UniProtKB/Swiss-Prot annotation:
GO CC, alphabetical: cytoplasm
Other facts noted in the record for this chain: Present with 172 molecules/cell in log phase SD medium.
Matching Gene3D superfamilies: NAD(P)-binding Rossmann-like Domain, ornithine cyclodeaminase, domain 1
Recorded family membership: Belongs to the ornithine cyclodeaminase/mu-crystallin family.
InterPro entries: NAD(P)-bd_dom_sf, ODC_Mu_crystall, ODC_N
Name this protein carries in UniProt: Uncharacterized protein YGL159W
Length: 370
């Protein structure tokens, strides 16, 4: 390694200009790291918190250290929490046996991209499954709804589009309608619009933005029609409601919706209502909520805590081999819908693993150009 830091700009530009196959390679590599975590939770050590100035009761600055130790990848993520400037930090990757530093990254882009990739692992598995076609895409249209307009929201939409572009969906898909729901600030769509040209004439992309006002807003219809829903808003009150998914007008045929929620990360936060979570407790077929970590989601996710979700109601992404335990049937009141619900709170394992994968992909990309 040279004496440089891999910047957020470098990471962003690499993934904005990579192929769909590179996205899939990164996703599968991240899935493997979560398998290692599920097999041995001890590779993720306890977080360490330290206030910068413990003599000052008014000081809001604290440091968070998140070490990862395994034979496959080792390193540490360090964040500084300043309530006035949000989180800033770094990710250091080392060789597990020698301790040699092999990569030092600014943390913002890696964090956002690894979260979006983790969100889409289950989606990729379901889209690419040839035995059980869950997605019907009525009238040749895939409806994707995203709550939020920030960095996380952008990467969720971008990666989902790249997966669809990879060809795993089939030739029947003609249109991807993306509906972005926001509170105050709209998303800049320049980068997403540039993807339209990559689809060619076979698939079109339509981009819409709606402000979240109330349940009767125009965006509510977008939610009810959705094949894919991403929740990327840190919010105390729910934005997604079970009754939106039970809307019998949403589909005349059986419909499947993949939902991933990543915005809430504290017990007081809620992205969806209690009624939706409770469906997984009452399901006779024992469908589970897909999570990155049982332990951490049950400590940090307000939605799961309020519904008293038990560990057996959850399945870790690292345990995901078949799809049957992640599909919940909502067929009631005339609604023909199944859903998969994924909840991500984030693990340092994901940061260190993706940082290491980035180094490998960048080296391979450089060699291919020579």
């Amino acid at each position: 390694m040279n004496n440089s830091i891999i910047t957020d700009d470098e990471v962003r530009e690499f993934y904005l200009n990579c192929s769909s196959q590179t996205i899939i390679e990164s996703l599968l590599s991240l899935h493997e790291s979560l398998r290692l975590y599920s097999q041995n939770h001890e590779i993720l050590l306890n977080r360490m918190f330290k206030k910068l100035d413990e003599t000052n009761a008014d000081s809001n600055i604290s440091h968070i250290f998140m070490p990862v130790v395994s034979k496959d990848f080792s390193g540490i993520k360090i964040l500084v929490n300043n309530n006035n400037k949000n989180f800033q930090g770094v990710i250091n990757v080392i060789e597990p046996e020698t301790g040699k530093l092999i990569g030092c990254f600014e943390a913002k882009q890696i964090t956002a991209i690894r979260t979006a990739l983790a969100s889409c692992i289950g989606l990729y598995k379901q889209l690419s499954c040839s035995h059980d076609k869950l997605f019907r895409f009525e009238n040749g249209t895939c409806y994707l709804t995203c709550f939020g307009t920030g960095l996380q929201a952008f990467w969720h939409i971008y990666i989902a589009i790249k997966l669809i572009m990879s060809g795993i969906v089939g030739e029947s898909l003609k249109l991807v309608e993306i509906n972005i729901l926001y509170h105050n600030n709209m998303m800049s769509l320049d980068r997403l619009k540039s993807l339209k040209n990559l689809f060619g004439s076979n698939i079109k992309i339509e981009l819409n933005q709606y402000q979240i006002n109330d349940i009767s807003s125009e965006g509510n219809g977008a939610v009810s029609n959705s094949d894919i829903i991403f929740g990327c808003l840190p919010t105390l009150e729910p934005n997604l409601f079970l009754r939106q998914l039970l809307n019998s007008k949403a589909s005349v045929e059986q419909k499947h919706t993949y939902i991933s929620l990543i915005g809430s990360y504290k017990p007081v936060m809620h992205e969806c209502d209690k009624e939706l979570i409770d469906k997984f407790k009452s399901d006779n077929e024992s469908a589970c909520i897909l999570v990155d970590s049982r332990e951490h989601t049950l400590l940090e996710s307000g939605e799961l805590i309020d519904s008293n979700i038990a560990p057996h109601n959850l399945i870790e992404i690292g345990e995901l081999d078949t799809l049957k335990n992640t599909v919940l049937n909502l067929n009631e009141k005339g609604c023909k819908r199944t859903i998969t619900l994924c909840k991500i709170v984030g693990l340092a394992v994901m940061d260190v693993a993706l940082a290491k994968e980035f180094l490998s992909l960048r080296t391979k990309n450089t060699e291919n150009k020579e």
